[in-house]
Design a protein with these regions (language model features):
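Conserved class I S-adenosyl-L-methionine
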Residues: 1-35, 38-46
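Acidic active-site catalytic centers that drive phospho-/nucleotidyl reactions
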Residues: 14, 42, 65, 89, ...
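Structural signature of beta-strand start/N-cap positions in the alpha/beta core
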Residues: 39, 59-60, 84, 99-101
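Class I SAM-dependent methyltransferase SAM/SAH-binding core
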Residues: 45-92
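A short acidic, Gly/Pro-enriched loop at the edge of an enzyme's catalytic core
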Residues: 91-103
Length: 104
């Protein structure tokens, strides 16, 4: 999809995903157990639902999305201090090789 569509969809994305809440809770638990104490990069975070839930288990987490609208939504409200949201194109990651212990 084009970036502009994701920017437009950003304000309602989280509400749309609520129908799958039970599935997400299961996923949060599984992911959290795999990233304990690790430096983690998440690609395509959207509004940061996963990142906000699992980041407390990580040493540090950078959650990225190429949609500025999604990152704007992700930065709303409270989130762990070890979590950073960045607008980044997954095709052109600005990080050095081996900068992270895990990827989502």
């Amino acid at each position: 999809m084009k970036k502009k569509i994701w920017d437009l969809y950003a304000p309602i994305y989280e509400k749309a995903m609520r129908a799958d809440r039970k599935c997400y809770k299961f996923m949060y638990h599984r992911v959290k157990s795999q990233i304990v104490g690790k430096e983690v990069l998440e690609i395509a975070t959207g509004p940061g639902l996963l990142a906000k839930h699992v980041a407390p288990a990580a040493k540090r987490m950078i959650a990225t999305d190429y949609s500025e609208g999604m990152i704007k939504e992700a930065k709303k409200g409270r989130y762990p201090e070890n979590l950073v949201f960045e607008v980044v194109d997954a095709k052109h990651l600005p990080y050095k090789d081996d900068s992270f212990d895990g990827y989502i």
